[in-house]
């Protein structure tokens, strides 16, 4: 034992420390992970919102420039002087017109719009002019360049991305990093399909891109037109590329919403895509943010979170260790105390930790205490029940009652007492048998103890196949106590039926105030239950409600008894059962005292036994007859009494009588049939047969019809017809001779009778049988 203690010493203490460490570590780790994840998501969300705002600002800045150029150029090219100029050849003598137009073009470039060049082309007079001067469309190259603009779009005014060409160019367009220009093309005149020329405003892409944020892996912003062509990009090398076949571009172009955000994968890299569609020129503004790059930027948050969690984890582990020592201190004291005193029994398994040793020790103490309490409780209960049995049987003196009552822990604190005597009505239609009666009475004992407060009753007891309980009235009046007794008895009946499926009746004594009167009270309760034969099942009978007049005059239904005995002699079981029920009903109704019941029932039983002997029927051995009176007096209900008499006497006697009659009837019927079969050729009459058999003709007629199902004359006619068919089929006897043998007056009567039964004449019947 000592070796085990050394090996397992403080095992639970280490588990407790481990538990507290886990209890403090897991929340810190979870909070740290949650904080990092939440911070990362918040950072990405903030960046997404920032990109959306940046995209809107970029759109506003660029469209402000484009709209300014568009409005200024539209206003200028719509003026009548300019339109007239397109029809002028602009020779040297028209220098003033050229100078005026050139000044206007230069004026348009003076606004802060990043315009680099303005071009005006006249198709009709074949000239064009820009910042460099006036030129003639005298070469095929220039002519083709000018004609190409009339075929590009149906719109009279549009923005387009172009490189420098022979007709429209900028000085910045010659640089490698600024090859593209954003050109505003307007066909002139604007409101006519008869194109005379065009006006073009050129903005270098490298100038407009200054209005966009700088390019980085985490900041990729560009603009595409409705065909997916990159118009502007903060990475100038990507300007002019087509993204029309890219999935995310097709998805956005197919959307009806003007703006939105979603995630996509491009070249196996996850991006956050933000887009904004322009209502001005059908361009779409895109911002692509690399999520891995964003997460790299959020790593600083992760390191800060890790540092904070590490500090919290260190503190929590320290507090866990100190807290475990503090909480374990009382457990350690208990453990060492039980370990020193060797509380473990030899047969028990050695404990695995401190708590198991303490638990086993406490269980041993509790088991010993419970056993002691249960023993004392059982002894006290048994002593109380034994005391109550002796009290009700009157085997205790006044002095013994007082001494033992107090020694059993009971207090004499009451105003009235009353004794309830309970009997089980019947075990018919229940799952119990007669052998279960004692167990059922003890079950009722337990039921009463559970459902009636202990201050309202003394210990219930089982006395002579009855259950008896003394109820207590501490302060109420006698009338209130009687009402309470009725309610309590009703409750006991309901509980017995619900829990035990039993029907019980209860007899209640008169109230008394001294325990020594319990014997008289028990006799009163038992006496009250004797009246249950007159009442129904589940009766509650108060002794003080009984008719106490002493009388020995009994009422007996003699006429009903005669009718019953006649029915038995006639073998009429149905009538016999009805008469038995009527006799018992009369006895129970007309005799109000239980002693009168017993006298009348005993008288009836004597007469039944006499009838049994008169009829020569023995249902019992002589020795058994002595027990019949004890059996019938033990029956408690009308139904039980009726069933016992019916099953033990009336029905068996009726069956015996019927069996005898059936045998006699069959013998008589067989004799009559024998005479008919051998003497059918003679003049047979029922009177003649009755004379020979020494019976009344009417009696023989009824017996024969009862046994055979047809009358005597019908049977004779049927048998003679049978013999006629046999003679016709098997002999050559003439029809006339057959009619004479069968005692027909003439052959015509025989022929008519035969044809009526068979449907053909005797001659035809004979021919039919012989032809078969």
UniProtKB/Swiss-Prot annotation:
DNA-binding region boundaries: 687-708, 735-758
TM annotation in the entry: 16-36, 301-321
GO terms for MF: DNA-binding transcription factor activity; sequence-specific DNA binding
Residue ranges constituting the HTH araC/xylS-type domain according to the UniProt record: 670-768
Alphabetical keyword list: Cell membrane, DNA-binding, Membrane, Transcription, Transcription regulation, Transmembrane, Transmembrane helix
Entry-linked PROSITE patterns: HTH_ARAC_FAMILY_2
Protein topology in the membrane: Multi-pass membrane protein
Pfam families assigned: dCache_1, GGDEF_2, HTH_18
InterPro entries: CdaR_GGDEF, dCache_1, Homeodomain-like_sf, HTH_AraC
A single cellular component GO annotation: plasma membrane
Subcellular compartments: Cell membrane
Main location: membrane
Protein's name in the database: Uncharacterized HTH-type transcriptional regulator YtdP
């Amino acid at each position: 034992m000592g070796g085990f203690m050394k090996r397992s010493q403080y095992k639970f203490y280490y588990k407790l420390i481990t538990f507290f460490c886990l209890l403090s570590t897991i929340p810190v780790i979870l909070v740290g992970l949650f904080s990092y994840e939440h911070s990362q998501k918040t950072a990405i969300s903030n960046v997404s919102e920032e990109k959306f705002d940046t995209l809107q600002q970029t759109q506003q800045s660029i469209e402000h420039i484009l709209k300014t150029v568009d409005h200024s150029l539209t206003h200028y090219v719509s003026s009548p002087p300019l339109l007239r100029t397109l029809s002028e050849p602009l020779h040297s003598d028209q220098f003033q017109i050229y100078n005026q137009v050139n000044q206007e073009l230069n004026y348009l470039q003076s606004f802060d719009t990043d315009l680099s060049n303005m071009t005006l082309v006249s198709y009709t007079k074949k000239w064009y002019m820009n910042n460099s001067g006036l030129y003639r469309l005298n070469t095929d190259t220039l002519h083709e360049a000018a004609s190409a603009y009339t075929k590009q779009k149906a719109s009279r005014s549009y923005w387009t991305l172009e490189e420098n060409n022979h007709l429209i160019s900028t000085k910045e367009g010659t640089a490698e990093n600024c090859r593209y220009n954003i050109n505003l093309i307007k066909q002139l005149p604007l409101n006519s399909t008869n194109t005379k020329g065009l006006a073009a405003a050129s903005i270098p892409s490298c100038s407009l891109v200054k209005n966009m944020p700088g390019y980085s892996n985490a900041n990729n912003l560009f603009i595409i037109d409705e065909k997916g062509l990159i118009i502007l990009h903060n990475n100038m090398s990507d300007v002019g590329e087509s993204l029309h076949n890219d999935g995310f571009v097709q998805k956005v172009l197919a959307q009806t919403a003007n703006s939105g955000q979603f995630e996509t994968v491009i070249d196996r890299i996850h991006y956050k895509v933000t887009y904004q569609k322009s209502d001005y020129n059908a361009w779409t503004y895109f911002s692509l943010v690399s999520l891995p790059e964003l997460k790299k930027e959020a790593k600083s948050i992760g390191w800060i979170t890790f540092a904070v969690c590490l500090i919290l984890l260190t503190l929590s582990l320290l507090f866990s260790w100190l807290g475990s020592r503090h909480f374990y201190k009382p457990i350690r004291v208990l453990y060492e105390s039980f370990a020193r005193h060797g509380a473990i029994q030899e047969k028990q398994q050695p404990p695995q930790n401190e708590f198991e040793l303490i638990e086993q020790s406490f269980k041993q103490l509790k088991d010993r205490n419970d056993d002691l309490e249960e023993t004392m409780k059982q002894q006290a209960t048994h002593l109380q029940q034994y005391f109550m049995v002796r009290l009700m049987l009157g085997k205790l003196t006044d002095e013994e009652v007082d001494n033992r009552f107090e020694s059993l822990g009971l207090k004499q604190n009451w105003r009235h007492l009353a004794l309830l005597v309970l009997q089980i009505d019947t075990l018919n239609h229940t799952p119990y048998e007669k052998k279960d009666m004692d167990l059922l009475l003890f079950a009722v004992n337990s039921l009463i103890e559970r459902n009636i407060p202990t201050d309202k009753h003394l210990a219930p007891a089982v006395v002579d196949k009855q259950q008896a309980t003394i109820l207590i009235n501490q302060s109420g009046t006698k009338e209130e106590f009687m009402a309470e007794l009725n309610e309590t008895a009703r409750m006991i009946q309901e509980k017995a039926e619900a829990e035990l499926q039993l029907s019980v009746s209860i007899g209640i004594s008169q109230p008394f105030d001294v325990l020594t009167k319990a014997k008289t009270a028990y006799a009163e309760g038992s006496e009250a239950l004797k009246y249950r034969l007159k009442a129904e099942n589940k009766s509650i009978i108060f002794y003080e409600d009984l008719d106490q007049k002493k009388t020995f005059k009994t009422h007996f239904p003699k006429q009903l008894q005669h009718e019953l005995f006649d029915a038995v002699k006639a073998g009429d079981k149905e009538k016999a059962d009805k008469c038995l029920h009527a006799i018992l009903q009369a006895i129970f109704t007309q005799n109000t005292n239980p002693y009168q019941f017993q006298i009348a029932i005993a008288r009836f039983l004597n007469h039944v036994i006499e009838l049994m002997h008169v009829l020569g029927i023995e249902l019992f051995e002589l020795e058994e007859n002595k027990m019949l009176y004890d059996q019938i007096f033990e029956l408690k209900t009308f139904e039980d009494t009726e069933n016992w008499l019916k099953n033990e006497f009336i029905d068996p006697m009726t069956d015996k009588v019927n069996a005898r009659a059936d045998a006699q009837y069959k013998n008589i019927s067989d004799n009559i049939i024998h005479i008919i079969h051998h003497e059918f050729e003679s003049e047979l009459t029922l009177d003649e047969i009755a004379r020979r058999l020494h019976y009344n003709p009417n009696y023989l007629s009824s017996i024969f019809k009862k046994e055979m199902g047809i009358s005597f004359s019908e049977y004779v006619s049927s048998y003679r017809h049978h013999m006629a068919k046999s003679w016709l089929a098997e002999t050559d006897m003439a029809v006339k001779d057959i009619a004479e043998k069968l005692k027909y007056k003439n052959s015509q009567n025989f022929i008519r009778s035969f044809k009526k039964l068979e449907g053909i004449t005797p001659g035809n019947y004979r021919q039919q049988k012989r032809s078969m």
